[in-house]
Swiss-Prot record:
GO molecular function: chitin binding; oligosaccharide binding
Keyword Ribosomal protein part of the UniProt annotation: no
GO BP terms, alphabetized: carbohydrate metabolic process; innate immune response; negative regulation of cytokine production involved in inflammatory response
Pfam families: Glyco_hydro_18
The protein's name in its UniProt record: Chitinase domain-containing protein 1
Induction remark: Up-regulated by IL4/interleukin-4 and dexamethasone in the macrophages. Up-regulated by glucocorticoid.
Residue ranges of every copy of the GH18 domain listed in the record: 79-393
């Protein structure tokens, strides 16, 4: 009897089961039919007809990994190119090894500067420093400068007040920073501090940054500064860093990483960096083009996914963007005013979504603008983009 039961069970288990695919299952099955090239190309994207406004989702999925390996070290953009890499998007480390020659500076997001007491400072995050990666990058990209971002972290208003009002404090801060650069074989730093301090201490902050830059220069190191957009997004109001501050710091700093992205908000979905706003931010900073070569126009290699029914948004990096294209096969729309692509899709729970993410065309337009304005570019960040983006640089 038991043998008969086992045979019946085996027959049922092996018999075909006929079911109806749900809509979500059907989409998943359909997504498998979208192809992705895994091999490199012998031509850059500019020569393959891929830099277009009438973009198709299928084309992005098919081509995004297929960069031109033969020209991976050739530069197409003459200005300075700063690229950020982060520990949480490790693909950026690999990108830098392959395309390092296209950059003038690489800024790993490793370090924080903290005040521990009177005339006592510490640079934390050194556990993230990868000397082997630094050696590998420098080996393949001669002349490339590695300038980690140095974030002023956990500073209180009193910390700023005590430091900015004291030459001894500023001197100790500068010594600490220079010594870390020497010990770790850095070429300088990209300092991020401007957004952390209220406007009433700008004079003191300019003095401190000038002193720090002079100390770094004496050690043959570079000093760059992250700055917010000169025009507040969504308004015609000046931002926290204006022409006045730029004129004072431009002679002493080596570059300014201008954050020309994150224009739209969750409550007002839209482009990441409308072209007219990007242009205005540069022109307001330096209307007479005196120091334009030191401005590094910010390019976002990430996008935003807006859930319009919830007034919410989430950052979109390359892998998620490609998966969304596979799952929904949306119609890509070119916003000619902002010079960005976007698309819409629907989710059963969160309803309508709008996604703005950079494309070859939107990046090419911004690189052309940078050439026209005489500025460099800074990219946030290399691990978030698509591999074929780098053909443009």
């Amino acid at each position: 009897m038991r043998t008969l039961f086992n045979l019946l069970w085996l027959a049922l288990a092996c018999s075909p089961v006929h079911t109806t695919l749900s809509k979500s299952d059907a989409k998943k099955a359909a997504s498998k039919t979208l192809l992705e090239k895994s091999q490199f190309s012998d031509k850059p994207v500019q020569d393959r007809g891929l830099v277009v406004t009438d973009l198709k989702a299928e084309s992005v999925v098919l081509e995004h990994r297929s960069y031109c390996s033969a020209k991976a070290r050739d530069r197409h953009f003459a200005g300075d190119v700063l690229g950020y890499v982060t520990p949480w998007n490790s693909h950026g480390y690999d990108v830098t090894k392959v395309f390092g020659s296209k950059f003038t500076q690489i800024s790993p997001v490793w370090l924080q500067l903290k005040r521990r007491g009177r005339e006592m400072f510490e640079v934390t995050g050194l556990h993230d420093v990868d000397q082997g990666w630094m050696r590998a990058v420098r080996k393949h990209a001669k002349g490339l400068h590695i300038v980690p971002r140095l974030l002023f972290e956990d500073w209180t208003y009193d910390d700023f007040r005590n430091v900015l009002d004291s030459e001894d404090e500023i001197e100790e801060l500068s010594k600490t920073v220079v010594q870390v650069a020497k010990n770790q074989h850095f070429d300088g730093f990209v300092v991020e501090v401007w957004n952390q301090l209220l406007s009433q201490k700008r004079v003191g902050l300019i003095h401190m940054l000038t002193h720090l830059a002079e100390a770094l220069h004496q050690a043959r190191l570079l000093a760059l500064l992250v700055i917010p957009p000169a025009i507040t997004p969504g308004t015609d109001q000046l931002g926290m860093f204006t022409h006045k501050e730029f004129e004072q710091l431009a002679p002493v700093l080596d570059g300014f990483s201008l954050m020309t992205y994150d224009y739209s908000t969750a409550h007002q979905p839209g482009p990441n960096a409308p072209l007219s706003w990007v242009r205005a931010c540069v022109q307001v900073l330096d209307p007479k083009s005196k120091w334009r070569s030191k401005i590094l126009l910010g390019l976002n290699f990430y996008g935003m996914d807006y859930a319009t029914s919830k007034d919410a948004r989430e950052p979109v990096v390359g892998a998620r963007y490609i998966q969304t294209l596979k799952d929904h096969r949306p119609r890509m729309v070119w916003d000619s005013q902002a010079s960005e692509h976007f698309f819409e899709y629907k989710k059963s729970r969160s309803g309508r979504h709008v996604v703005f993410y950079p494309t070859l065309k939107s990046l090419q337009v911004r690189l052309e603008l940078a050439r026209e304005l005489g500025v460099g570019v800074s990219i946030w960040e290399l691990g978030q983009g698509l591999d074929y983006f780098y053909d443009l640089l």
